[in-house]
Amino acid sequence: MSNQHIEELNDQQIVRREKMTALAEQGIDPFGKRFDRTANSAELKEKYADKTKEELHELNETAIVAGRLMTKRGKGKVGFAHLQDREGQIQLYVRKDSVGEDNYEIFKKADLGDFIGVEGEVMRTDMGELSIKATKLTHLSKSLRPLPEKFHGLTDIETIYRKRHLDLISNRESFDRFVTRSKMISEIRRYLDGLDFLEVETPVLHNEAGGAAARPFVTHHNAQNIDMVLRIATELHLKRLIVGGMERVYEIGRIFRNEGMDATHNPEFTSIEVYQAYADYLDIMNLTEGIIQHAAKAVRGDGPIDYQGTEIRINEPFKRVHMVDAIKEVTGADFWPEMTVEEAIALAKEKQVPLEKHFISVGHIINAFFEEFVEETLVQPTFVFGHPVEVSPLAKKNPEDTRFTDRFELFIMTKEYANAFTELNDPIDQLSRFEAQAQAKELGDDEATGIDYDFVEALEYGMPPTGGLGIGIDRLCMLLTNTTTIRDVLLFPTMKP
């Protein structure tokens, strides 16, 4: 440690380092060693929930707990403290005549934030709080910095996102939200595993961005001296596995898109993609509904859920509507009759729909109508299906009306939560779609993809009829934890240095 660093320490930090040195001089390792616990705070509270003070005294049961010291009070020969572990907090009752002089000195000199182990009798105070009456204290690790202000938790938003460790220590609500996230993902896995899906892993580094319309991050592989991109989707590799005969696969993993950031978008995020051979988009609709309802029930219980004051009937069958019907219902514009691009553009101008240079077909304009007018009306869970071919380069055409695809998106609270379709397995059609995307890219569409000839070749070996699905894990977690910003469900959101 340099002198310059020591000079920058504040008074509290200096005192804590002095205590660290004092512990070492007493033969106590300031940063401890392994420690065996018999219970955590939640287990004790559950086990003894219905026991009175007198009953606990009669039982005379002991427990060994460990955690971070969050509060400490008292003077003389008696003290109280709260110890925090992963499940919550439990009160400590420490008497000098119970732990001995040396042990009590450890307690007196302990700072908030220190980790200690405690062995003692399970009791209830006169105020009715379940506590541990300590008989032995063990110093486990020294905290060299003071914790955030103890009564109000960490409230500075910038610090919450940059120093998530402090947020987790200080804010139980935040801690529980991330526990819920983990449980949600585990339940999704459990649901799919129960349906005989196989979890797989595919590359993060790709030679060509594909599987979605998004701008990629570009990096360089030094050993091979080639530019590569971080994946914007797992789709094309997973479909290669369907070609290979795996039939039912899914991957939960990180996706990277070099795009804007807002309340629902982070450049690095988690998605799940699922592919099922011999299925179509209607089968995948049912699968999607099952996944989301199973996850919601696991973390929020039966019945509807509240999201920011709106009751979401997530437990009921999801509404299903064709995109063209949804547009007609909201705007009156009818795209069912065949029309020219010029007629569609005129209709868009009449309704003041913003037009981009790469809108070169009726399909692009239909999609623009939907995004401009319909999305904001979709509050309850709604499957919107029948997207135009032009905005669905990997989806199979609807056999009854080839202007549209057998694709759907799930909307809840006006946001997209899932995207799925009957997969395109015709390699000739796939190449044609890729070429159309390449043309759009040349016209300025930064999100259009290039041509993945290797994937087209894989399709030429034959892929069975397949349904595929993608769900944004972070956005689903926001819904199920009643959170308004994606940063609150990402442990370490992207931040400027």
UniProtKB/Swiss-Prot annotation:
Keyword field: Aminoacyl-tRNA synthetase, ATP-binding, Cytoplasm, Ligase, Magnesium, Metal-binding, Nucleotide-binding, Protein biosynthesis
GO BP term (any one): lysyl-tRNA aminoacylation
Main subcellular location: cytoplasm
Cofactor field: Mg(2+)
Binding of Mg(2+) 1, residues: 409, 416
Catalysed transformations (reactions): tRNA(Lys) + L-lysine + ATP = L-lysyl-tRNA(Lys) + AMP + diphosphate
Residues the record lists as binding Mg(2+) 2: 416
UniProt-recorded Gene Ontology molecular function terms: ATP binding; catalytic activity, acting on a protein; lysine-tRNA ligase activity; magnesium ion binding; transferase activity; tRNA binding
EC number per UniProt: 6.1.1.6
Stored InterPro entries: Aa-tRNA-synt_II (IPR004364), aa-tRNA-synth_II (IPR006195), aa-tRNA-synth_II/BPL/LPL (IPR045864), Lys-tRNA-ligase_II (IPR002313), Lys-tRNA-ligase_II_N (IPR044136), Lys-tRNA-synth_II_C (IPR018149), NA-bd_OB-fold (IPR012340), NA-bd_OB_tRNA (IPR004365)
GO cellular component term, pick one: cytosol
Compartments, as annotated in UniProt: Cytoplasm
Record text on cofactor binding: Binds 3 Mg(2+) ions per subunit.
PROSITE patterns per the UniProt record, alphabetical: AA_TRNA_LIGASE_II
NCBIfam families: lysS_bact, PRK00484.1
Xref: HAMAP family: Lys_tRNA_synth_class2
Classification via PANTHER family: LYSINE--TRNA LIGASE, CHLOROPLASTIC_MITOCHONDRIAL (PTHR42918:SF15), LYSYL-TRNA SYNTHETASE (PTHR42918)
Subunit and interaction comment: Homodimer.
Similarity annotation: Belongs to the class-II aminoacyl-tRNA synthetase family.
Protein name in the entry: Lysine--tRNA ligase
Organism: Streptococcus pyogenes serotype M1
